[in-house]
């Protein structure tokens, strides 16, 4: 049963699904759609052509779908789509897109922590975590299972690859390859996100191959492109490696991140069932 507090302001035309909870002093504008089982907590503000997926919770004072912070915007009809079972926490801001017909898209099962900012024309995959005060500029792409640490700033048009983990306080100016971990400003890749991949039950052999490919690409005396081709020949039959190589060979206009922590590259081992296995 839908439960709407009498102090909530819901404009005519807004579409409200079944079993929706709308708490005190919420504002829902006329072009918003709330799917079934959505919870909108006090003082949240939802504007624009915004669709909130089933089971998602919008926490107090979050702002979604308002005018993009882009001087190029001239009132075009643009969209925000948030998937199912997401948590949009307190004071998070998700603006609408800039160009006619474009969408800011957030996938399913994402956690957007307090004060995080998702700017115009961003695309976020499934199971993504944006930590407190993470700031995404316009046109950023964050792929599935990526984790962005607290107070990270991501430059416009950058891509963050799947399963990547970006450490807190980092400044991201170039594309971050999938499956990697890193930190710093300027950003330094620290290797493969071994713990995250293990937690997601990626097979040991795949994790080991990714570690070897990373070292081949980032430590080789050959050029970056040549190292990728060598990795393709040796490990390209593994889907995750293929994804890593394709990502690096097809960067955004920002280019691929090539800075790597020298100390991390000296670590030649990976855990398997408690034992240390040389790579």
Swiss-Prot record:
Q: Which domain of life, per UniProt?
A: Bacteria
Task: Report the main location listed first in the record.
Answer: cytoplasm
Compartment list: Cytoplasm
Instruction: Check the record and name the Pfam families matching this protein.
Output: Acetyltransf_11, Hexapep
EC number(s): the record gives: 2.3.1.129
Q: Which GO terms describe its cellular component?
A: cytoplasm; membrane
Membrane-crossing residue ranges in chain numbering: none
Tell me the segments the record calls region Disordered: 256-279
Q: Which reaction does it catalyse?
A: a (3R)-hydroxyacyl-[ACP] + UDP-N-acetyl-alpha-D-glucosamine = a UDP-3-O-[(3R)-3-hydroxyacyl]-N-acetyl-alpha-D-glucosamine + holo-[ACP]
Task: Name the Gene Ontology molecular function terms of this record.
Answer: acyl-[acyl-carrier-protein]-UDP-N-acetylglucosamine O-acyltransferase activity
- Pathway named in the protein's UniProt entry: Glycolipid biosynthesis; lipid IV(A) biosynthesis; lipid IV(A) from (3R)-3-hydroxytetradecanoyl-[acyl-carrier-protein] and UDP-N-acetyl-alpha-D-glucosamine: step 1/6
Task: Give me any GO biological process, just one.
Answer: lipid A biosynthetic process
Among InterPro entries, the record links this protein to: Acetyltransf_C, Acetyltransf_C_sf, Hexapep, Hexapep_transf_CS, Lipid_A_LpxA, Trimer_LpxA-like_sf
The protein's UniProt keywords, in alphabetical order, are:
Acyltransferase, Cytoplasm, Lipid A biosynthesis, Lipid biosynthesis, Lipid metabolism, Repeat, Transferase
Q: Please report which protein family the annotation says this sequence is part of.
A: Belongs to the transferase hexapeptide repeat family. LpxA subfamily.
Subunit details: Homotrimer.
Q: What does this protein do?
A: Involved in the biosynthesis of lipid A, a phosphorylated glycolipid that anchors the lipopolysaccharide to the outer membrane of the cell.
The entry's protein name is: Acyl-[acyl-carrier-protein]--UDP-N-acetylglucosamine O-acyltransferase
Organism annotation: Chlamydia caviae (strain ATCC VR-813 / DSM 19441 / 03DC25 / GPIC) (Chlamydophila caviae)
């Amino acid at each position: 049963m839908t439960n709407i507090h009498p102090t909530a302001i819901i404009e005519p035309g807004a579409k409200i699904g079944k079993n929706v909870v709308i708490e005190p002093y919420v504002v829902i504008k006329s072009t918003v759609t709330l799917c079934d089982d959505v919870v909108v907590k006090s003082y949240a503000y939802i504007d624009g052509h915004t669709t909130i997926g089933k089971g998602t919770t919008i926490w107090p004072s979050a702002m979604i779908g308002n005018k993009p912070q882009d001087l190029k915007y001239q009132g075009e009809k643009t969209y925000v789509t948030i998937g199912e079972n997401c948590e949009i926490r307190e004071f998070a801001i998700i603006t609408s897109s800039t160009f006619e017909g474009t969408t800011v898209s957030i996938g399913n099962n994402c956690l957007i922590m307090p004060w995080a900012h998702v700017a115009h024309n961003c695309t976020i995959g499934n199971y993504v975590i944006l930590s407190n005060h993470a700031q995404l500029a316009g046109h950023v792409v964050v792929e599935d299972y990526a984790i962005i640490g607290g107070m990270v700033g991501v430059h416009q048009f950058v891509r963050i690859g799947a399963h990547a983990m970006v450490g807190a306080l980092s400044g991201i100016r170039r594309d971050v390859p999938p499956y990697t971990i890193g930190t710093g400003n300027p950003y330094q890749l620290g290797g493969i996100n071994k713990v995250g991949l293990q937690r997601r039950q990626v097979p040991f052999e795949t994790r080991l191959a990714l570690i070897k490919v990373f070292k081949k690409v980032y430590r080789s005396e050959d050029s970056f492109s040549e190292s990728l081709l060598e990795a393709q020949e040796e490990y390209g039959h593994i889907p995750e490696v293929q994804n890593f190589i394709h990502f690096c060979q097809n960067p955004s206009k920002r280019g691929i991140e090539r800075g790597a922590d020298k100390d991390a590259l000296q670590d030649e081992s990976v855990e398997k069932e408690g034992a240390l296995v040389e790579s």
